Structures are given as structure tokens and as C-alpha cells.
């Protein structure tokens, strides 16, 4: 899947403790996480006495300009956020980190992922008199914390975390500490690094640690939270009801290829998936082409395994923001023409294996196939380095309805005809799991593959009724004929 198909990541979070240039380093860290969200960005800083922040709409360079940075320089602690809206509207009021000033403390908080029981929690809180200032589900946890009777902020945080469901990470800043939180399934990643001067870093991906020249310390695991203070770092647990289920889509599409998740480099995983795809679904052709940018690693693996030349038959305009961030399908489709072009002299008269990482709605791959054929390509064999994207995701990906998914209603043969390809094949679920190579004692070896299997490790909660109401016949058939490990509340079947 290209960067233009309408599949969107939720957000990226970053935090740093005890560095004299915390705001500047946070800005750099967020820049390396820009691929995770382009609708807005923000930074909150602290100096043990005061918390203050800046935020704005658009790319990081548009949201936080030099004059904003001058307002937050000189503070030693910071958190930052880049946003793509998976819940809530796209106004400035939803740009994070949120900054709260209470009579007894100030708190900055930002969030990556989606809370699948936020609607019901919000309703209960409003019935108790809570007033919300945004439509983002992140605000829910702050209300839960403030309504807790626990004696300390940390205890109130732990109590509140046990009430929320979904795939999430949080970065939270107070005057005394920096907190990092991971959901009970570790669906969304969070890592810790350390700089030469002793400053600690939290980030959604290791690439944000690497860009600052910091040392990777560890992943934060399922149901864990980290507390960073002037005394050092401590990793604790807020729940022992955990089952590791790391999002497969982080490896397939969302994360940067130079990032490492749970010990597995993203580029290496994608290349391995391309090799496995070639083993499972070879094709006779003159060359292999990948859809820029997230499919290039898989395409190189496919070409290497099958012994075909790997060519640059598609070129991406690197100076246009990623189209998938556009809020309407029409804008996304127009963006494909602006951002991708075929190299006619390479593809003219050739049989091509076109490798993409996924098909979600099918509109983008259809346009790319047409673009290549208009440029003279002969036969086009589409190979997808992931299984059929048949089920919606509720854990922070902007595909939360069955109607958006072409594989929910169409077979591979029907999709092949729809997109104008000469053949179409997908990587198997087992092939994906083995290519990634995790080895947790958990279903799917510790992967969350809900979009391919309809098996939801964190449950469905507020989404259950609508999800079940709109299940297609293909989805029902898949569920009936394949083993599922989790019930609608994310509990393992006994």
C-alpha cells in the first residue's frame, strides 16, 4: 500500500527528562516521528515549578515555529506529540499534548492509539458532572485521574489505566516526573533511551532515539509504565492481566524502516515478508517494482528471492506531504496523481510484479495499475506483502468500518478484476507471523493481526454492536472457519 491509500496511523509521542535543551530535542524527535501524524503537533515543557506549552495545526514546521520555540526554551523536561485524528475532530482543541492547570498541580498528557470504551466512559463522566473541552478520547483519562480517591497522582494513574480499554501509549509530564504507559497488549509501541548526559527519552519508535544519538535502553512491555525522575528510571506494572499482541501493521506499514520494534528491525521484517511472499506466490515477469515508500523493502525481498531485477518503476514526489493524511477520499485520490509517477522508459512493454504492503479500499492500487499500463506496461501481477485486510481496526488505525474495506465484500479474484491487474495474491497469515518472527507465548506469537483475522486482543467494547451489525458474508465465513483466541472483551478463550 502506498502512502496515499487512506490508511492512517494514529499519532506519535515523545518525552525527555533532564536535558537543558529539552524543547529543541523534542522538536527533533517529533520530526523523526512525523510519518505517524501530520494534522498537528505540540510540545509541553516543565522546570519543576511551571508547565507551559505550544501547539498548532499542520506539519511540525507549520505547527511550531521559531517564535513558539522561543517561548519554551530553557526548560529541562518536555513531552511532544504529532497527531493524526483517529477519534475526535481536527480542530486545534484536539491537538496534543493537553495541558491542565489544577489548584494542586499541572499535568501535560499526550496519547497514541484509541480507547475503545471512551464513549461509555465519557457518558458516565458527563453524568457525574464532568465537562469536556475536546472530542479527543485522551481527555477521558485525565477526568478519571482527577476523580480518583487515590492518595497520589501515580496511584490515581494506575487506577485509571485499569478502567480504559484499547491500544494505547501515553506520555505524561508533571513537575516531578515523566511517565510512559503501554496498554495491556502492547499493541502500540513505546521505547526508552538514554543520552550521554544522562537524560532519558521516551518515544513511539527507536528512530526518534537514534536521531538524537541516544542509546536504546528497553521496550516498555504490555501493562507496564515507566516513571522517570531526577532519581532515575523505574519500570512498574499497573496490571498483570496482559497478553502481548503487538500491532502487525506497525511492521507492515506504519513504523519507519530504520526503527526496531520488540527486537525486530522493520526493514528486515518487510524484506523477509517479501521473500516469503515470493515463495508463496511466485510470478513470471521481467522485473519487480515496489510502491514507494513503505513497500520498497518487501519488493526488494521479493525480487531477491525470485531472481528478478528490482527496478524503480514508480517515483514519489518527496516534497508533497503524505496524501493519506487528507481527510476526504477525493483529496486522497487526487494526491496519488501528484505524488506518484511511472518511469515510462523502465516499464514500457514489460511484465511487472507490483509489490504493495496492503490493499485497504482498493482505490489507490487501481490508479497505480492504470498509471503503469498507460505508461506501456504489459502484464501486471500485484503481490501484497500482508494478508487480506478484511476486518476493521479499532486500536488507532483510521479504518473502523467494514464498508471501507474492499476485502470485506470482494474475493481476491473480484479485486483483481476491479483494480485491472492480471493476477493478485496475498501473503498468508502464517507467512506474516513467521516473517516478523516474534516468539511470545501468546496467540499469533505475540502479534495483533485483528485486521486480517477479526480476532481482537483488547476486545470491542463500544464498537461491538455496530461491528457485528455490519459484518459481511465474507467476514462471517472467515470467522466461522478459522480459530479465534479472544472474546469481545479481549479475554482469552479457555
From Swiss-Prot:
Residues in Glutamine amidotransferase type-2 domain copies: 11-231
UniProt xrefs under SUPFAM superfamilies: N-terminal nucleophile aminohydrolases (Ntn hydrolases), PRTase-like
Superkingdom field: Bacteria
InterPro entries in the cross-refs: GATase_2_dom (IPR017932), Ntn_hydrolases_N (IPR029055), PRibTrfase_dom (IPR000836), PRTase-like (IPR029057), PurF (IPR005854), PurF_N (IPR035584)
Active site: 11 (nucleophile)
Alphabetical keyword list: Glutamine amidotransferase, Glycosyltransferase, Magnesium, Metal-binding, Purine biosynthesis, Transferase
Protein's UniProt keywords contain Magnesium: yes
Residue ranges that the Swiss-Prot or TrEMBL entry lists as coiled coil: none
Enzyme Commission number(s): 2.4.2.14
Cofactor(s) the record lists: Mg(2+)
Residue numbers binding Mg(2+): 294, 356-357
Keyword Nucleus in record: no
Propeptide boundaries: 1-10
UniProt function note: Catalyzes the formation of phosphoribosylamine from phosphoribosylpyrophosphate (PRPP) and glutamine.
NCBIfam families: purF
Identification of the protein by name: Amidophosphoribosyltransferase
Gene: purF
Amino acid at each position: 500500500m502506498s502512502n496515499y491509500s487512506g490508511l492512517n496511523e494514529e499519532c506519535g509521542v515523545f518525552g525527555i527528562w533532564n536535558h537543558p535543551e529539552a524543547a529543541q530535542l523534542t522538536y527533533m524527535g517529533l520530526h523523526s516521528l512525523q510519518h505517524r501524524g501530520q494534522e498537528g503537533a505540540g510540545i509541553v515543557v516543565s522546570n519543576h515549578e511551571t508547565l507551559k506549552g505550544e501547539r498548532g495545526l499542520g506539519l511540525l514546521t507549520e505547527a511550531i515555529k521559531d517564535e513558539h520555540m522561543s517561548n519554551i526554551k530553557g526548560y529541562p523536561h518536555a513531552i511532544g506529540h504529532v497527531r493524526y485524528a483517529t477519534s475526535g475532530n481536527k480542530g486545534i482543541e484536539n491537538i496534543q499534548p493537553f495541558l491542565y492547570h489544577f489548584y494542586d498541580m499541572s499535568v501535560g498528557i499526550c496519547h497514541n492509539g484509541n480507547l475503545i470504551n471512551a464513549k461509555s466512559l465519557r457518558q458516565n463522566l458527563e453524568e457525574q458532572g464532568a465537562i469536556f473541552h475536546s472530542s479527543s478520547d485522551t481527555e477521558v483519562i485525565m477526568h478519571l485521574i482527577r476523580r480518583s480517591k487515590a492518595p497520589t497522582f501515580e496511584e490515581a494513574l494506575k487506577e485509571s489505566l485499569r478502567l480504559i480499554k484499547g491500544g494505547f501509549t501515553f506520555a505524561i509530564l508533571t513537575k516531578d516526573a515523566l511517565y510512559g504507559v503501554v496498554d495491556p497488549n502492547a499493541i502500540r509501541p513505546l521505547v526508552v533511551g538514554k543520552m550521554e548526559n544522562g537524560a532519558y527519552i521516551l518515544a513511539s519508535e527507536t528512530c526518534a532515539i537514534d536521531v538524537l544519538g541516544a542509546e536504546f535502553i528497553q521496550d516498555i512491555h504490555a501493562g507496564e509504565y515507566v516513571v522517570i525522575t531526577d532519581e532515575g528510571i523505574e519500570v512498574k506494572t499497573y496490571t498483570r492481566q496482559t497478553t502481548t499482541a503487538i500491532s502487525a501493521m506497525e511492521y507492515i506499514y506504519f513504523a519507519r524502516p530504520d526503527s526496531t520494534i520488540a527486537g525486530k528491525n522493520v526493514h528486515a521484517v518487510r524484506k523477509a515478508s517479501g521473500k516469503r511472499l515470493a515463495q508463496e506466490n511466485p510470478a513470471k515477469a521481467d522485473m519487480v517494482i515496489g510502491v514507494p515508500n513503505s513497500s520498497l523493502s518487501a519488493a526488494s525481498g521479493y525480487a531477491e528471492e525470485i531472481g528478478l531485477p528490482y527496478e524503480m518503476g514508480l517515483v514519489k514526489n518527496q516534497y508533497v506531504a503524505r496524501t493519506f493524511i487528507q481527510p476526504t477520499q477525493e483529496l486522497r485520490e487526487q494526491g496519488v496523481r501528484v505524488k506518484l509517477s511511472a518511469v515510462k522508459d523502465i516499464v514500457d512493454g514489460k511484465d511487472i510484479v507490483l509489490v504493495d504492503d496492503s490493499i485497504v479500499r482498493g482505490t489507490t492500487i487501481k490508479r497505480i495499475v492504470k498509471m503503469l499500463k498507460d505508461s506501456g506496461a504489459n502484464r501486471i501481477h500485484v503481490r501484497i506483502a500482508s494478508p487480506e485486510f478484511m476486518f476493521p481496526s479499532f486500536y488507532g488505525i483510521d479504518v473502523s468500518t467494514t464498508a471501507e474495506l474492499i476485502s470485506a465484500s470482494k474475493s481476491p479474484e473480484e479485486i483483481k478484476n476491479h483494480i485491472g491487474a492480471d493476477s493478485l495474491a496475498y501473503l498468508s497469515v502464517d507467512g506474516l507471523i513467521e516473517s516478523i518472527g516474534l516468539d511470545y507465548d501468546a496467540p499469533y506469537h505475540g502479534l495483533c493481526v485483528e485486521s486480517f483475522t477479526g480476532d481482537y486482543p483488547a476486545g470491542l467494547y463500544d464498537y461491538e454492536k455496530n461491528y457485528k451489525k455490519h459484518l459481511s458474508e465474507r467476514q462471517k465465513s472467515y470467522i466461522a472457519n478459522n480459530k479465534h483466541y479472544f472474546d469481545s472483551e479481549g479475554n482469552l478463550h479457555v
